[in-house]
A protein has these predicted regions:
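Conserved alpha/beta-hydrolase "acid-adjacent" motif
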Residues: 120, 294, 301-307
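Conserved HGGG/HGGXW glycine-rich cap/lid loop of the alpha/beta-hydrolase fold
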Residues: 101-147
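Short alpha-helix in the alpha/beta-hydrolase fold that links the catalytic acid
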Residues: 124, 290, 304-314
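Gly/Ala-rich beta-loop-alpha elbow adjacent to hydrolase catalytic centers
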Residues: 178-188
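Catalytic active-site module of serine/aspartate enzymes centered on a nucleophile-bearing elbow/loop
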Residues: 75, 318-354
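Active-site nucleophile loop of the alpha/beta-hydrolase fold
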Residues: 142, 200-212
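Short beta-strand/loop motif that positions the catalytic acidic residue
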Residues: 288, 294-297
Length: 354
């Protein structure tokens, strides 16, 4: 018979067991005006993408994407091939080995993170188009993590199926998978199922997903409200309108807004709690393709950047960019131009036939 020691009993009283797939969903209803605003932002983004030459398609499983390349005829589709050897995964490429059509640049498949969809990434997409005007770019659209009213929350494997399908239907030769935040989970799962040429991961929450910091940030949402109340109690409500608060207490406000207006949205909560399997979506460094780039923003509050950087540098051949003084998602801001330019330069240098 096993008996717990006093130290184990004390640990149990301090740490609660987490079972995110069975616990109460914990979602919050969003105001109708807020949902309407999000859909309006999505509509404006769609208009801009159409002006830039993108067209929206729906995959066979219902997931949608935008791409600036035409769909090939069905008799030209090339199924993913396998090579002999120990690695039995099919190769993610929509072109045959003997297809010699020249590509202007490495095709890109981009997967966005939590937020309001593709709209915040438009400056990033614009820079990629300017660096190589003829570049083929596909953009996965994930409305269930964009705070939009949607009746279905797909599994991540369904998003991976969409990546493979669009690669085949639009004849993308060995595309580079480019993802931010939640999008890195889709890319991680794609790397598990396919042999991928290269990846670019921004704020890679999928790498070392087992680290305690990532776990606590994603699921221990109740602490943000108590932290905010404690800050106001100790400093008074007037403290919220001082420069000191925005410098030192900004993190508290960030968590409050994020947890109660973004992460608590029903589609996002379903994706993170009911459709999320840790072991399946985790990415280890030795699973990252050689011609890859990992971008870490030093003040990222969602991941342990130092631990991730050490793991990637020790166990893979990927290049790592460490951006000081940036927090999660700041690369999409106006002052992230140079960082986006560095990513575009990396993508421009990738070989198109491997």
């Amino acid at each position: 018979k096993l008996e717990r020691t006093p130290s184990e009993e004390s640990d149990e009283s301090e740490e609660a067991f987490m079972f995110h797939t069975k616990e109460t969903l914990g979602s919050m209803h969003q105001p109708l005006m807020f949902t309407a605003w999000v859909h309006g932002v999505s509509g404006m983004c769609a208009m801009i993408l159409k002006l830039w030459g993108f067209k929206r398609y729906t995959a066979s499983n219902g997931c949608s994407y935008w791409i600036n390349a035409p769909m090939a005829k069905e008799d030209e589709w090339v199924e993913a091939r396998r090579e002999t050897g120990d690695d039995a995964r099919p190769i993610l490429s929509g072109c045959a080995v003997d297809d010699v059509d020249a590509e202007v640049a490495k095709p890109i498949i981009f997967v966005h993170g939590l937020g309001v969809g593709l709209a915040p990434y438009l400056p990033n997409i614009a820079q990629l188009l300017r660096s190589k005007p003829g570049r083929k770019i596909a953009l996965l659209s994930l409305p269930h993590i964009s705070m939009r009213a949607t009746p279905k929350v797909p599994e991540i494997d369904a998003m991976v199926d969409t990546v493979a399908e669009l690669t085949t239907k639009h004849k993308l030769r060995a595309p580079c998978l480019y993802g931010h935040s939640f999008g890195t989970f889709v890319i991680a799962r794609t790397c598990h199922r396919y042999r991928v040429s290269s990846v670019v991961l921004l704020d890679p929450v999928a790498i070392c997903l087992c680290l305690p910091k990532t776990v606590s940030i994603l699921y221990h949402l109740g602490n943000c409200w108590s932290s905010f109340k404690s800050y106001v109690k100790n400093n008074g409500t007037k403290a919220m309108f001082t420069t000191t608060f925005w410098r030192d207490g900004g993190d508290v406000l960030y968590y409050l807004l994020r947890d109660y207006f973004l992460v608590r949205e029903i589609g996002v909560m379903t994706a993170l709690r009911r459709k999320f399997w840790w072991a399946t979506h985790n990415l280890w460094a030795d699973q990252i393709p050689d011609n890859s780039l990992i971008v870490l923003e030093a003040h990222d509050m969602l991941i342990d950047c130092e631990a991730v950087a050490k793991h990637v540098l020790r166990q893979s051949n990927a290049r790592v960019i460490w951006q000081d003084n940036f927090s999660h998602g700041m690369f999409i801001s106006p002052w992230g131009f140079s960082l986006r330019h560095e990513v575009a330069t990396f993508l421009d240098a990738l070989p198109t036939h491997s």
